[in-house]
């Protein structure tokens, strides 16, 4: 996707994947700065380290404590989080973004922190469910401190019998369920999340899984319903990163075609929304 975009604007396609152990990351970041890299993307579990290691962080990165993008220039290493742009694009493109909604958020990792930042600006209430409740509570506490936040935040646990009535109510009232965990495995499909009160969900609730691929989404197995995957989010967070690196308008259709080909699906199945690019991480001509 990124190489196709670089080629489309006349630059050499040199976007490469690097697989690293956690212990190798500090040396790699120093090398990237010294060897003239223009930018980097980070996936789990390196998003927190990307925030901590950068010389300059955007406000969104400071709020969430995670970054998925670095821009490297004469200004030094700058950290951004374009996941928020991607999420907003995905929810808007599918007509799922509406003020005053109640949301169930699965997971409390790096992706969930950016998702929470967006949800806090328009949702009425957000229930965060995670196997480590302390991580879920940290997300809630961070969002409640933000001036843009208008949501009520809640953490409930299936393991606590006293939480079950509140869980049932939250699921029954949820307009959206967003799975940020990013794991499509058989073990997860039969794990503790399978015992959540999925039958209580309203039939009108929209379901989103930030992961993508050919394996079934756990959400679809738990609910027996259709689930939107994260391809649209991936496209738009990638386009925002592209513009940060190049200071050029991202060739969104080229990127979509390349992504669709990689995923083996029609390009039309991945909606495009140019207005989402730079919505939260503003830059260049979009300021």
Residue ranges and their predicted role:
Residues 123-149:
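NAD(P)-binding Rossmann-fold cofactor-contacting core
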Residues 121-125, 225-226:
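Conserved S-adenosyl-L-methionine
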Residues 132, 157-192:
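Rossmann-like NAD(P)-binding element
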Residues 79-81, 91, 95-120, 129-135:
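Glycine-rich adenosine-cofactor-binding loop
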Residues 252-287:
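A short, charged, Gly/Pro-tolerant segment at domain boundaries
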Residues 1-96, 214, 222:
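Phosphate/diphosphate ligand-binding glycine-rich loop within oxidoreductases
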Residues 72, 185-188, 192-258:
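Rossmann-fold NAD(P)-binding glycine/threonine-rich loop
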